From Swiss-Prot:
Organism: Escherichia phage Mu
Induction: Expressed in the late phase of the viral replicative cycle. Expression of late genes is activated by the viral late transcription activator C.
GO terms for cellular component: host cell cytoplasm; virus tail
Phenotype seen when the gene is deleted: Accumulation of free heads as well as free tails longer than normal and variable in length.
Gene Ontology BP term (one): viral tail assembly
Pfam families noted in UniProt: Phage_Mu_Gp37 (PF08873)
Record has Iron-sulfur as a keyword: no
Protein's UniProt name: Probable tail terminator protein
Amino acid sequence: MLEETEAALLARVRELFGATLRQVEPLTGTWTNEDVHRLFLAPPSVFLAWMGCGEGRTRREVESRWAFFVVAELLNGEPVNRPGIYQIVERLIAGVNGQTFGPTTGMRLTQVRNLCDDNRINAGVVLYGVLFSGTTPLPSVVDLDSLDDYERHWQTWKFPDETPEFAAHINVNQEKDHDAEN
């Protein structure tokens, strides 16, 4: 479920930007200093990471959080040839917000943050985080094909006016002999 969502989100970014970004990749690694430093090496670029999940509206889903890490040399660049943070963030929001990616539906923008410190800004590179949340269904833990057909269940009926309950086993898949009823 997460791999499908990640692949669909990355495909959408590539579709939105074509060849204007140097890198569009998942953010892999262990978040060491080297991994974080790698973000700043090829602006303009977009990296994607699943940031975890929270409780969904039902037991069968979770609220997944995804972060796009946007790196650029400019705050405000040229929309086509040399996009800056503003152009990349605007296009990401417009292209992702409210959409479905793989099994994850209803992607919603939750936050945009400047993640740079003064050292990076003085070096001429800016990093922004663009965070989205979406509903992701959980995979079923039961293989429905492995279950036998539903054969029998216990049913009770309550009638009005203090009539006693009626209860019976019902055979669901039993063939009726229509000739015997006539």
